[in-house]
């Protein structure tokens, strides 16, 4: 019996704004800039790349290139895309384990 494998696209499962926000939050927790960019690209595809392009003023090609696995978007582009996605970038103090009394 031959097994047929299909490519999994996580964008297909990101159907709610909450799921998209959690997906991006988890990507940021990895502290891997390339993975964060890729995750934002996945969420942008889930939301609709044309819609994101229209809201940011960036071309679809620029978005695909910037938020690919090898992309390196500028902070300006990242903030614009996150705003278009309805995801807020926030900062919290980092609590180091060795500083806990």
Predicted region positions:
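Long, contiguous binding/interaction regions
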Residues: 57, 80, 94-101
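N-terminal flexible/basic segments that precede or flank functional cores
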Residues: 1-42, 98-101
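Short basic helix-loop element that most often maps to the first helix and adjoining turn
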Residues: 36-55
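DNA major-groove recognition helix of helix-turn-helix/homeodomain DNA-binding modules
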Residues: 75-92
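Recognition helix of helix-turn-helix/homeodomain-like DNA-binding domains
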Residues: 57-73
């Amino acid at each position: 019996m031959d097994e047929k494998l299909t490519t999994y696209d996580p964008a297909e499962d990101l159907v709610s704004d909450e799921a998209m926000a959690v997906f991006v939050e988890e990507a940021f927790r990895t502290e891997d800039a390339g993975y964060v960019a890729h995750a934002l690209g996945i969420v942008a595809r889930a939301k609709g790349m044309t819609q994101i392009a229209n809201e940011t003023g960036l071309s679809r090609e620029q978005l695909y290139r910037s938020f690919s696995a090898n992309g390196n978007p500028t902070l300006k582009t990242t903030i614009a895309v996150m705003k278009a996605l309805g995801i807020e970038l926030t900062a919290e103090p980092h609590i180091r384990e060795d500083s806990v009394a």
